[in-house]
């Protein structure tokens, strides 16, 4: 049968429904007919050379991130970093100066925010503003980065725009700036990427099934040949035994025993075919979830200076400060600046304990550290934190480092 997956999106202030199709036929003939219909529907919109390049890359299926790398698919890394990651974990997004400039707003930071808020109000799009003394401000490291660009007087009066992922998505699709065309082009490119990757998964599965079936047919042919040879041997043995007067009862028993062994092997082969069908069903589920999986990862940014980074250092000062550790999260260029400033002005003897480059969501990493600590008496009573500051006994320093490293490794889990 042809399984249809429906995905709803909103483009240019209108809602559209996109259908993707997965194959599940009852027999080989039905599968071939359905596959031809699917190719007629989809292939005309795809670049077949990119698809073939991905198929030729490996006999193991690759994820969407590797797929983009292999095919050199043209997609905006900033959009993935600032939008699709937010969509994946459903977190709130701070509208930073970088985002406003990416959307095409020009001028001073304050003027950019005013222009964007004007659009939001005109289109009745929800947003929130945090005052400078809001206790949740520390959840958005880029607020601190943007604050450095403003005077203290302006910072004290500033309000920082916060939006959820759906509202942010609506807003960028309603832009009328110099970059609005590029942003809409991104959505069209992303739709093509989804279709191309789903077709890649289909083709990969088809190839894998053919390889399995070919191997299985070879095995069955060998078993049929063995059975035929066994029967021929039995006939010859009967003839030989008859010629020398042996009792045919013993020969018949041996023949039945051989036949039973062959039947057992055939039954085992049928079990193997059933296992393959169950594996295919599981793969159907994987293909169906690809629409979610594409949001789970993002290609690495080409410019190292704007890749996200997470650093934890030990202050190593002579005071008895309860918070002896400090975390910095943000783009690499920002982290380098903060480290230099803190080392020259406050912590000349600092020791960097953790430096994770290209951590896709460093803020998320720090929050998950707190989540891991909370509720566990063996850790909760021995760790304290305030903002980016962390305190623990020196005996637990190694344990703290291991927790961060373990949390970072979880980004590789699919």
UniProtKB/Swiss-Prot annotation:
Keyword annotations: Coiled coil
Superkingdom: Viruses
One Pfam family, short name: MSV199
Keyword RNA-binding attributed: no
InterPro entries: DUF3627, MSV199_dom
Coiled-coil segments on the chain, per record: 209-293
Protein name listed in UniProt: Putative MSV199 domain-containing protein 148R
Species of origin: Invertebrate iridescent virus 6
């Amino acid at each position: 049968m042809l399984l249809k997956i429906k995905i709803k999106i909103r483009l240019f202030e209108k809602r559209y429904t996109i259908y993707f199709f997965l194959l599940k036929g009852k027999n080989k003939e039905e599968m071939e007919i359905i596959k031809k219909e699917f190719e007629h529907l989809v292939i005309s919109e795809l670049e077949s050379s990119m698809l073939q390049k991905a198929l030729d890359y490996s006999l193991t299926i690759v994820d969407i991130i590797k797929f983009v790398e292999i095919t050199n698919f043209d997609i905006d890394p900033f959009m993935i970093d600032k939008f699709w990651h937010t969509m994946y974990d459903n977190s709130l997004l701070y509208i930073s100066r970088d985002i406003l400039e990416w959307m095409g707003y020009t001028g001073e930071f304050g003027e950019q925010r005013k222009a964007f808020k004007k659009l939001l109000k005109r289109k009745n799009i929800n947003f929130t503003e945090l005052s400078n003394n809001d206790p949740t401000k520390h959840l958005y490291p880029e607020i601190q980065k943007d604050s450095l660009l403003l005077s203290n007087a302006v910072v004290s009066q500033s309000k920082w725009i916060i939006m959820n992922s759906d509202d942010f998505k609506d807003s960028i699709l309603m832009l009328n700036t110099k970059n609005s065309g590029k942003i809409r082009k991104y959505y069209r490119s992303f739709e093509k990427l989804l279709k191309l990757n789903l077709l890649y998964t289909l083709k990969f599965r088809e190839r894998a099934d053919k390889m399995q079936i070919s191997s299985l047919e070879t095995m069955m042919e060998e078993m049929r040949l063995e059975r035929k040879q066994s029967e021929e041997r039995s006939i010859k043995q009967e003839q030989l035994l008859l010629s020398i007067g042996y009792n045919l009862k013993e020969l018949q028993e041996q023949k039945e025993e051989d036949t039973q062994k062959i039947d057992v092997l055939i039954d085992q082969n049928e079990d193997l075919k059933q296992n393959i069908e169950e594996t295919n069903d599981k793969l159907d589920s994987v293909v169906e979830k690809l629409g979610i999986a594409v949001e789970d990862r993002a290609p690495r940014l080409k410019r190292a200076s704007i890749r996200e980074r997470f650093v934890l250092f030990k202050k190593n000062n002579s005071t008895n400060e309860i918070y002896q550790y400090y975390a910095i999260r943000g783009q690499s260029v920002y982290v380098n600046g903060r480290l230099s400033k803190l080392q020259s002005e406050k912590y000349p003897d600092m020791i960097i304990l953790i430096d994770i480059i290209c951590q896709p969501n460093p803020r998320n990493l720090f929050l998950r550290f707190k989540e891991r600590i909370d509720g566990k008496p063996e850790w909760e009573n021995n760790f304290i934190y305030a903002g980016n500051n962390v305190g623990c006994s020196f005996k637990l320093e190694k344990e703290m480092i291991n927790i961060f490293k373990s949390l970072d490794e979880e980004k590789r889990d699919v």
